[in-house]
Amino acid sequence: MTLHMPCKTVKALIKCSEHGPVFITIEVDEMIWTQKELKEALSDGIVKSHTNIYNCYLENIEIIYVKAYLS
């Protein structure tokens, strides 16, 4: 996990128990300053990436890798 706080871009490799790994990129308008805000951005990004179409609900998703940076 590589975190540069504050950040505006987050890349994550996630895995649902039923499917293989999915790579998502999240770009936010406002800076992410805390790990709590980072978790919220990841949750929103997972939902917006339509990963949940494949029955991957947040409680079933494993976050394998996260990279957060400013640009």
UniProtKB/Swiss-Prot annotation:
A GO biological-process term: negative regulation of cytoplasmic pattern recognition receptor signaling pathway
What are the record keywords, sorted? Host cytoplasm, Host-virus interaction, Inhibition of host innate immune response by virus, Inhibition of host MAVS by virus, Inhibition of host RLR pathway by virus, Viral immunoevasion, Viral RNA replication
Keyword Translocase attributed: no
Q: Where does the record place it?
A: Host cytoplasm
Molecular-function GO terms, alphabetical: protein sequestering activity
Q: Does the keyword field hold Glycoprotein? A: no
Q: Which GO terms describe its cellular component?
A: cytoplasm; host cell cytoplasm
Enumerate the transmembrane spans: none
- Subunit structure as annotated in this protein's UniProt entry: Interacts with host MAVS; this interaction inhibits signaling pathway leading to interferon production. Interacts with host MYD88; this interaction inhibits innate response in dendritic cells. Interacts with TRIM25. Interacts with IRF7.
> What task does this protein carry out?
Mediates the regulatory switch from transcription to RNA replication. Acts late in infection by inhibiting viral transcription and up-regulating RNA replication. Plays a major role in antagonizing the type I IFN-mediated antiviral response. Interacts with host MAVS and prevents the interaction with its upstream partner RIGI in the signaling pathway leading to interferon production. Inhibits host RIGI signaling by preventing TRIM25-mediated RIGI ubiquitination.
The UniProt similarity line reads: Belongs to the metapneumovirus M2-2 protein family.
> What is the name of the protein in this document?
Protein M2-2
State the organism of origin: Human metapneumovirus (strain CAN97-83)
